Amino acid sequence: GHLGFGMDWAQYDLATIVAEIRAWLQSESLDIPLIPAGGIFTGSDAVAFVEAGAAGVQVATRFTVTRECGLPDDIKQEYFRANDDDIEVNQISPTGYPMRMIKSSPGIGDGIRPNCEAYGYLLDSQGRCAYIEAYNRELAAHPDARRLSVKDKTCLCTHMRNFAIWTCGQTTSRLKDTSVRAPDGRYQLLSAEHVFRDYQYSVEGRVALPEADVAPAVPATHDAA
């Protein structure tokens, strides 16, 4: 979920970055595999990068809605349903890096007690965490509150472990176009093999829909935004 950029992330283009790095590697006579990642949604996208000199590609978003993915199935439905305006890039991570996530993530704004004693993955070299500082600030401001709300940071260690922060890729809103909906309104989960094969064999930017487990209510691509 961390973007690796500042809040000016939208000014950068993956194809341009890959071209610049490839040119630099060639100028320095460095034989280092170049593997782009981020927004590569179809096999055609992947082929374009390989033809531009990439050694391979890294993909993730489409696999979040596969049966093999470790996310709970109900949360996978949140990924399917998400539209562009349901997703934000924020700075609530204690690392300070921007993260992209679904706005309805229950961990956003939650004031859970810090769990650094149990996890503490993000503590700095002095044992500090930006969430602890934010939590203590809210605790001092609202000493009698039964439940705190911390808006500017999140207890990332705990919420990621408990599937309460739903980080996602920039093409998440397109996931609904990769599946079909059952009569109950739920999107059909895909198999990792189906997604992998689609990356291998899709052409002209097309996405292969799965064979429906039951008669679909409507093709997913007909959903209103």
Residue ranges and their predicted role:
Residues 1-33, 41, 48-225:
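Conserved active-site-proximal phosphate/metal-binding subdomains
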